């Protein structure tokens, strides 16, 4: 795959729905005031809130999001290496308000599917359709000692304060110190994310602390995304020791030691332990998760839950296979779901639209790799039809990623 052109991006990312614009959506006449409540203002939820309003301005949309700022997880690994500033990844929700989205910076406390309402503090919000896009929570109990140490053992897997804290720990590392990071077992948010992080930390150490090294303990048998590309990148970093099939089972902050499932004890000076993950608690408590008790099962045409009617689930909380838990996929799901919801509210058959995915991974201060995935819908399930990878790391690919992020951030929040 050569440079990602705008046309390729629109085709593969699901942005074609966005590019249609409100004026070209089907005319959906309002019979009465309907309300859609959206839980979570991330890549999926914020997109869905905006596009419900674009699809049918007669629908009242309320977005529940505790944070007053949108902080992008994509590109946050660059902050760890001093290549990017977190301020550049931080935006507000003003654009959504311009589209008529009502925003309450509060957390949803509980979902009551039988009464079609969401508890927010001491109040209730009733809905005709609910869109749940709450992201992920961590399974602290899967690593012995982690629950007690979770405030000091950083994951930095939700961009924000921990991103800055981990960056400071790396800056304070003595030259010759050891950094250990762990990769959780699949499925988890952003499959290539840990390997991008490993690349950026290795680059930082090679540049700033050449006597130091990075040990990556991967719970999976092999690199799970962009495998060949990351293997080639890892070979370029002599200070990076990659250990597959080594799951972190215990953390001892007193002795600064991680124990793996094969009995290895690994000493560290800085630890970045990314825990196993599941759908956020609000989705688990509402019994939206499937048999695995981790991820939510949905219909891939409407993203309606298979467990509860009139509730739709987006983004990282969904099982999603074969699509990855990526920001681009969540954005794509948000647009597809929004259009489906407005059709359903008006007793119309929802259109069938597959999601798309474009994912960039930086591997040094100036180079990146990328993948594009294309899908179709078969029997109301997503099926992958094509995957294209860049041939190797490239400065051009890295530069293209800036255009991609500007476009998609505007699509979500603009």
Residue spans for each PLM region:
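FAD-site-proximal beta/loop scaffold in flavoenzymes
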Residues: 148-175, 266-270, 274-331, 343
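Glycine-rich dinucleotide-binding loop and its adjacent helix/turn
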Residues: 134-207
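N-terminal secretory signal peptides and thylakoid transit peptides that target proteins
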Residues: 1-20
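Internal hydrophobic alpha-helix adjacent to the cofactor/substrate pocket in enzyme cavities
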Residues: 330-354
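A Rossmann-like FAD-binding core segment of flavoenzymes
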Residues: 101-110, 118, 125, 203-294
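C-terminal auxiliary extensions adjacent to catalytic cores
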Residues: 372-414
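Glycine-rich, N-terminal phosphate-binding loop of Rossmann-like dinucleotide-binding domains
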Residues: 13, 122, 134-135, 183, ...
